[in-house]
């Protein structure tokens, strides 16, 4: 497992320009993914990946669970995290790569973020109930044990229980931004998220910039501002 300094050296030497396949943005069932951390290792091996980063929302809890499996499979596991942040009222995601999953400050802050998510989830569920949908926090948590529940988990719950015809419909009709059951939540400032990732020894990367719906000028300003705050990279390929 490498640290941030090693990552920098490898980057300068063109280490990531070879033919090895990697994936630096992967979620597990510790947040809104569909595979457990251990299952992700198996999937990565089958896909022929040389390395992958486990970057669950607001948690590094899956990293220790995947480490032994990754070692046995001969795959490099990059410890990571994805933080939902606020940039002048716009939600922007920052991925941290090579973070220390045991860093005390990171653990403390992510616990705060998770509590905010829990409060928000309860309000979303209440709003969905007000629309006549059959969902409870108890049922949602029972189907998503020991993980950070996101809107994607809620959307999948609605779909799997026949409340909507697709996950997309759940977002489009109910819980997407500006929809009737959407509930905002506290988000750490983008600049503070970058500082937190650095404090945990990590590399801060702007995630999927194409998804923010910004024009060229606004996107350039976002990148310029975050670079001034210490941003290390930009996600160029996202799927």
Predicted regions and their residues:
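Extended substrate/RNA-proximal surfaces in nucleic-acid metabolism proteins
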Residues: 71-220
């Amino acid at each position: 497992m490498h640290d941030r300094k090693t990552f920098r050296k490898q980057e300068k030497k063109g280490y990531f320009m070879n033919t090895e396949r990697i994936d630096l943005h992967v979620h597990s069932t510790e947040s809104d993914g569909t595979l457990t951390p251990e299952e992700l290792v198996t999937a990565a091996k089958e896909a022929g990946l040389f390395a992958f980063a486990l970057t669950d929302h607001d948690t590094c809890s899956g990293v220790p669970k995947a480490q032994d499996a990754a070692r046995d499979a001969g795959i490099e596991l990059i410890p990571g995290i994805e933080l939902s942040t606020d940039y002048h009222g716009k939600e922007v995601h920052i991925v941290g790569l090579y973070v220390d999953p045991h860093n005390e400050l990171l653990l403390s802050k992510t616990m705060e973020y998770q509590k905010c998510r829990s409060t928000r989830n309860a309000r979303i569920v209440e709003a969905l109930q007000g629309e006549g949908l059959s969902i409870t926090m108890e049922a949602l948590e029972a189907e998503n044990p020991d993980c950070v529940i996101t809107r994607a988990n809620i959307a999948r719950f609605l779909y799997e229980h026949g409340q909507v015809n697709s996950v997309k419909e759940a977002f489009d009709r109910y819980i997407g931004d500006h929809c009737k059951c959407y509930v905002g939540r506290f988000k750490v400032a983008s600049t503070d998220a970058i500082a937190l990732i650095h404090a945990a020894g990590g590399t801060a990367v702007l995630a999927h910039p194409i998804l923010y719906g910004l024009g060229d000028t606004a996107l350039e300003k976002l990148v310029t501002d975050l670079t001034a705050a210490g941003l290390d990279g930009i996600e160029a390929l996202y799927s």
